[in-house]
Structure formats: C-alpha cells, structure tokens
C-alpha cells in the first residue's frame, strides 16, 4: 500500500512539472509581453498572440487562434523560417493544442491524488489504475502534438532567433514526463495485481 501511494505521488509530481512547462507557454506574449515562444525581428510570438518591440511597443489582442504569419518581418527574415507563411498560418491554428494539453496535464496531476483517497485496501483497484493510465496516454499524445506544433511554428534558421534553450528544455520536459508517468503507472498496475494474487493464495 505504501509503495502504491508513493508511485501515485511520484506520478503526480512528474505531471506537475509538465503542467508548469505548459503553463509557462500559455503565459507568453501578449499576456506577459517580454515572454515568447519565439522572437524574430522585434516580434515576440506567444500562444495567444504576439508583441512587437521594434520601433514602438504594441501587442495583439488575446485570441484563441491567431494568424502567426500576419506580421511580415522586414528584409529577408521572412525566408529564414523553417516553414512557408502559408504553412505557418495553417499550423498556427493548431496552437489551441497548447491549452488543451495544459488542461489534460493538470487533470493528470490531480487525479492520482484523488485515487489515493479512493484506493480500497483489499479491494479491486484495477479499474482506477486503468482509467488513470488511459488518461496519461491521452496526455502524452497531446503533449507530443503540442510540442511538435511549437517547434514547427517557432523554429527559425537564424540561431539568434531560435527559441531559447530554457524554452526548449521545458518542451522536452513536457513531452518526456508524461512518458515516464506511463511507465510509473505500469509499475503501479503490477503492484496492485501482485498484491491481489498474494491475497488469493494466502
């Protein structure tokens, strides 16, 4: 029982780290003006909009979906993006996956804590563990998709304007920790089934 609780607490902790990373992504420009998923030619791109720092400081409205290719960067900088403006506009509509992944990681963080209180000693807990594992698989898929969207949309060929190492580390955390959580829940399933088997043979 103690091992099972520790596994759930560790799982919740990993999801908390992943949730923190996505929360930082959601707070980028224009919510926090100087924070962005990518900066190029005086434009800071965020999840819900952008801010321009060149000449005069101005920000777009907070929108769930916005056109990331609307701001035409001066000079040849438009050609230095990995993707064309049309492709960036299409992928920009998928930025909604970031708040979706944020919500899923928060639920995945809170659910193991709830399961600890619902756990019945001597009872069958396979359904609780299975439902939690399914949720974490969905969370993993959403985090991988959201991180892929961010990388495709924000990566720039100019090394100076590529997302900072700090942002890339957070993206790695967001996609890695849910994968670790699935392994942790596999262990919890083994603990629960082995405990039930021992009770049947005793």
UniProtKB/Swiss-Prot annotation:
Localization: Membrane
GO cellular component: cell division site; growing cell tip; nuclear envelope; plasma membrane
InterPro entries: pH-response_reg_palI/RIM9, SUR7/Rim9-like_fungi
Pfam families in UniProt: SUR7 (PF06687)
Consequence of gene disruption: Leads to lethality in absence of CDC28.
Entry membrane topology: Multi-pass membrane protein
Residue stretches spanning the membrane: 91-107, 137-155, 168-189
Record's protein name: Protein DCV1
């Amino acid at each position: 029982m103690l091992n099972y609780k520790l596994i759930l607490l560790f799982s919740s902790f990993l999801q908390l780290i992943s949730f923190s990373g996505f929360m930082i992504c959601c707070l980028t420009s224009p919510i926090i003006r100087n924070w962005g998923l990518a900066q190029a030619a005086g434009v800071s791109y965020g999840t819900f909009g952008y801010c321009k720092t060149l000449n005069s400081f101005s920000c777009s409205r907070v929108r769930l979906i916005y056109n990331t290719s609307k701001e035409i960067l001066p000079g040849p900088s438009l050609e230095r993006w990995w993707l064309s403006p049309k492709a960036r506009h299409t992928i920009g509509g998928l930025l909604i996956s970031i708040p979706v992944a944020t919500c899923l990681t928060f639920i995945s963080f809170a659910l193991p804590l709830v399961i600890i209180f619902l756990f019945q000693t001597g009872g069958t807990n396979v359904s609780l563990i299975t439902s939690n594992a399914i949720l974490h698989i969905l969370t993993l898929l959403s985090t991988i998709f959201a991180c892929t969207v961010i990388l495709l949309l924000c990566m720039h060929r100019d090394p100076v304007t590529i997302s900072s190492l700090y942002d890339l580390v957070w993206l790695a955390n967001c996609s890695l920790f849910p994968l670790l959580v699935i392994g942790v829940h596999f262990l919890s399933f083994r603990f629960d089934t082995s405990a039930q088997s021992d009770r049947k043979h005793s």
